[in-house]
UniProtKB/Swiss-Prot annotation:
The lineage of its organism: Bacteria, Bacillati, Bacillota, Clostridia, Lachnospirales. Zn(2+) binds at C130, C133, C150, C153. Its EC number is 2.7.4.3. It comes from Lachnoclostridium phytofermentans (strain ATCC 700394 / DSM 18823 / ISDg). This is Adenylate kinase. One of its GO terms (cellular component) is cytoplasm.
C-alpha cells in the first residue's frame, strides 16, 4: 500500500501518517527525515543537498526525488509506505509519477486532509514549545498544568517562529499557490481521497482507515 499525504501545513498530515504506518506496519517517510539521514550518513546525495542548504538555497527537485526513490528501494518499503512532505508542486508530482512508472510501481492513494485556513491558524498559533526539553503543548488541546511552564521539566514555553500567525499565513499562501494544485492532479489520476480534517484526530484516522480498507482487503 503506497500512500501520499496531502493537506495544508497544520492539517495533521504527520500525525495521521504515523498512525497509518503503525497500523499497516509500513514506514512513515518524511522528506525532512530523508534529508537528515542522507546528510548525517554523508551519502553522495546528502553531500549534494548540503551544498545547496549551506548557501540557503532550495535543493533541486532532481536531488530530492533521487533521495525519495532511494528510500523507496529499501527493504522496509517492499509492502508500501506513507509519504509525507513530497511532492509539493506539480513538477515534483509528475517527476515522481514518471520515476515510479519506470520502476513498475504506482501510488495507491493520495489522501487530502481538508481543514479551513482559519482553523489552521488557530491550531498552529496555539502551539507552544519548551525552550529546555523541546516538549510540545497546545493552549487549547494539550494545555500545561501551569500556564507557560513545561509539565515535564519546568522550562519556559515559547511560540516557535513557524507557529506565529503571520508566518502561518505566509505558509498557507505558499501552500495554496504551489501545493493545492496537487489535489486536482491526483484527482485526475483517480487516486484522490478526501477526508474532513476538522474532526478529532481519532475520527479522522477512522475515516482514513475506511478508505484504505478498500486497498488492504
Amino acid at each position: 500500500m503506497k500512500i501520499i499525504m496531502l493537506g495544508a501545513p497544520g492539517a495533521g498530515k504527520g500525525t495521521q501518517a504515523k498512525k497509518i504506518a503503525e497500523k499497516y506496519k509500513i514506514p512513515h517517510i518524511s522528506t525532512g527525515d530523508i534529508f537528515r539521514a542522507n546528510i548525517k550518513n554523508n551519502t553522495e546525495l546528502g553531500a549534494k543537498a548540503k551544498e545547496y542548504m549551506d548557501q540557503g538555497l532550495l535543493v533541486p527537485d532532481e536531488i530530492t526525488l533521487d533521495m525519495v526513490m532511494d528510500r523507496f528501494a529499501q527493504d522496509d518499503c517492499k509492502n508500501g509506505y506513507v509519504l509525507d512532505g513530497f511532492p509539493r508542486t506539480i513538477p515534483q508530482a509528475e517527476a515522481l509519477n514518471k520515476a515510479l512508472v519506470e520502476e513498475g510501481e504506482q501510488i495507491d492513494y493520495a489522501i487530502n486532509i481538508e481543514v479551513p485556513d482559519e482553523l489552521i491558524v488557530s491550531r498552529m498559533s496555539g502551539r507552544r514549545a519548551c525552550v529546555s526539553c523541546g516538549g510540545t503543548y497546545h493552549v487549547v488541546f494539550t494545555p500545561t498544568k501551569k500556564e507557560g511552564i513545561c509539565d515535564a521539566c519546568g522550562g519556559e514555553l515559547t511560540i516557535r517562529d513557524d507557529d506565529k500567525p503571520e508566518t502561518v499565513a505566509k505558509r498557507l499562501n505558499v501552500y495554496h499557490n504551489q501545493t493545492q494544485p496537487l489535489i486536482n492532479y491526483y484527482h485526475g489520476l483517480g487516486l484522490l481521497e478526501e477526508v474532513d480534517g476538522t474532526k478529532e484526530a481519532l475520527e479522522v484516522f477512522e475515516d482514513i482507515i475506511g478508505i484504505l480498507g478498500k486497498v488492504a482487503q
